[in-house]
Regions:
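OB-fold and OB-like single-stranded nucleic-acid-recognition modules
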Residues: 17-142
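Bacterial N-terminal signal peptides
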Residues: 8-17
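Intrinsically disordered, low-complexity regions enriched in Ser/Pro/Gly/Gln/His and often acidic
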Residues: 6-7, 133
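Positively charged n-region of N-terminal signal peptides that target proteins for export
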Residues: 1-4
Length: 142
């Protein structure tokens, strides 16, 4: 019995000390999650207008979860929506959640508060340039 308890405690200690089940903290170049709504909105607007200045940077942002599926292509898009301080205007950044996830099974309800950390990039689709945080780590309710 004692041997079983000791073995179990060793396994738990080993799991905790090696980080099993814990997302690794990654260095962040631009952390917008702690800034006021107006400052974040302004910064995201700047990212929209001058995306080349941010390419390849790791960005963290807090906002609300949004989802869209193109009715023609059936392609799914996931975004974090950031409102300004007055909540009259909003900007969104698409994200690609690292790993395998299915909507709606692995996602919370729309507009759930979230924090997204990912590599900033852009892509072209149908003649438009879109912002995207790729290889994103997602925390719900934070």
């Amino acid at each position: 019995m004692k041997r079983t308890i000791v073995a179990l405690l060793c396994v738990i200690w080993l799991a905790l000390s090696t980080g099993v089940g814990v997302a690794a903290e990654r260095p962040v170049d631009l952390d917008l999650s702690a800034l006021s709504g107006t400052v974040v909105y302004s910064q995201v607007y700047n990212m929209v207008m001058q995306p080349d200045q941010y390419l390849g940077q790791t960005v963290r942002v807090r906002g609300n979860f949004s989802y869209f599926q193109d009715p023609v292509t059936m392609k799914e898009y996931f975004a974090v929506i950031i409102a300004d301080a007055a909540a009259c205007c909003a900007q969104g950044i698409e994200f690609v959640w690292r790993g395998e996830h299915r909507y709606p099974d692995d996602y919370p309800p729309l507009e759930t508060e979230m924090t997204v950390t990912g590599e900033f990039g852009t892509y072209e689709e149908n003649g438009f340039t879109y912002l995207q945080l790729s290889e994103a780590d997602v925390e719900w309710g934070k």
